[in-house]
Swiss-Prot record:
One of its GO terms (cellular component) is cytosol. This is Glycine--tRNA ligase beta subunit. Pfam families: DALR_1. It is found in: Cytoplasm. One of its GO terms (biological process) is glycyl-tRNA aminoacylation. InterPro entries: DALR_anticod-bd, Gly-tRNA-synth_heterodimer. It catalyses: tRNA(Gly) + glycine + ATP = glycyl-tRNA(Gly) + AMP + diphosphate. It is an enzyme of class 6 (ligase). It comes from Neisseria gonorrhoeae.
Length: 126
């Protein structure tokens, strides 16, 4: 909890909270159960980059959390801000193609799970 309080003072905290809020708002619109990301359905460079970043985060966050180093885990999450921003700027999540739309929601859900495995990211924005 102390690490979260310290991290909350950093500029990255607000960015992480904003990204989390945006992700959560989109996930509320999911009309099917969320599952695994299908790499073959990733079409745009921005979604491929976010997927790669999310893949890379998994072991780093797991290791940091296992060591009780939540500040490092939060910093790792904040490090993907450029990919998250590019994704939201360049990708229409609610695509007409249902499979592509579902896959994009799956990707965002994976990111949300990683964010909230560390702490309740929504609290960083308060």
């Amino acid at each position: 909890l102390q690490a979260v309080a310290v991290f909350k003072q950093l500029p990255e905290a607000a960015a992480l909270a904003a990204a989390n809020k945006r992700v959560q708002n989109l996930l509320k619109k999911a009309d099917a159960a969320l599952g695994e990301v299908n790499e073959s359905l990733l079409q745009q460079d921005e979604e491929k980059a976010l997927y790669a970043a999310a893949q890379g985060l998994q072991p780093k966050i797991a290791a940091a959390v296992a060591e009780g180093n939540f500040r490092t885990a939060l910093s790792e999450l904040a490090s993907v801000k450029p990919q998250v921003d590019a994704f939201f700027d360049g990708v229409m999540v609610m695509a007409e193609d249902a499979a592509v739309k579902q896959n994009r929601l799956n990707l965002l859900n994976r990111l949300a799970e990683q964010m909230n495995a560390v702490a309740d990211i929504a609290l960083l924005g308060e």
